[in-house]
Design a protein with these regions (language model features):
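Short, compositionally biased
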Residues: 49-69
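Glycine-rich anion-binding loops of enzyme active sites
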Residues: 1-56, 184
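Glycine-rich, charged/polar anion/phosphate-binding loops
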Residues: 1, 21-26, 87-88, 110-111, ...
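Short, well-ordered alpha-helical segments in soluble proteins
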Residues: 18-21, 41-47, 54-57, 83, ...
């Protein structure tokens, strides 16, 4: 899925290959009705990090002023230094949790959730007030007059884990502060629903959800 370009003709592309026991192999198509929908970490920061860098690049080109990103180090780091969530996989192993489906969030929460629903032939309900949003991300989003929820739903490049688990694993997931339960799986006929903080229901769509609609 990688398309790489270089202004100087030099590219480094790395592929990692691993092994897994057959009974531990988790795909996208195993989500079951009533499973819990969960994510690791927080969402939307990488998109905002990109927004900061693009803004500072424009300022530098126009004025020559060097960017001061010290107070936005976390957000910029979310874009430039994504981390593989090996700690989450280790937590699963330690607590004997086997997700029914899982994938990383590269194109935004909405898009990845719809992938799981399609391949598992299920629907879902997600709750806005359950989405994990970092305070720095929210603060900067508001300063740019952006919706933090929309950044989480459609920003992408967060590389957190989106996964589903059986309800019997609820306590194990809830005990980890780095994991959030954001919804549940439904029958496919019930569709894919996003419920706002105000209780309004909207169809979950790949480009995210717009507060102004």
């Amino acid at each position: 899925g990688d398309t790489t370009t270089s202004q100087r003709g030099f590219v480094i592309s790395i592929t990692a290959i691993g092994e897994v026991a057959p009974d531990m192999y988790v795909k996208r198509d195993g989500a079951k009705v009533n499973d819990l929908v969960c994510v690791s970490g927080d969402l939307g920061g990488a998109f905002l990090g990109l927004t900061i860098l693009e803004r500072e690049k424009k300022i530098f080109e126009e004025t020559g002023a060097q960017p001061d990103l010290e107070d936005r180090a976390y957000i910029v780091g979310r874009l430039l230094k994504p981390e593989a969530r090996k700690d989450v996989i280790e937590y699963f192993a330690e607590h004997k949790i086997t997700p029914t489906s899982m994938m990383d969030i590269s194109d935004g929460l909405s898009s990845e959730m719809l992938h799981i629903c399609k391949q598992s032939n299920v629907g879902c309900v997600l709750y806005e007030d359950k989405l994990p949003l970092n305070e720095d991300s929210k603060d900067f989003a508001y300063k740019l007059e952006l919706d933090p929820t929309a950044c989480a739903l459609s920003g992408g490049e967060d590389y957190e884990l989106l996964f589903t688990v059986a309800q019997t694993d609820h306590e194990k997931i809830a005990a980890n502060n780095g994991l959030s339960i954001i919804g549940y799986i439904t029958e496919a006929s019930e569709g894919k629903t996003f419920i706002t903080r105000g209780g309004n229901k909207h169809e979950l769509v790949a480009q995210g959800w717009n507060h102004l609609k």
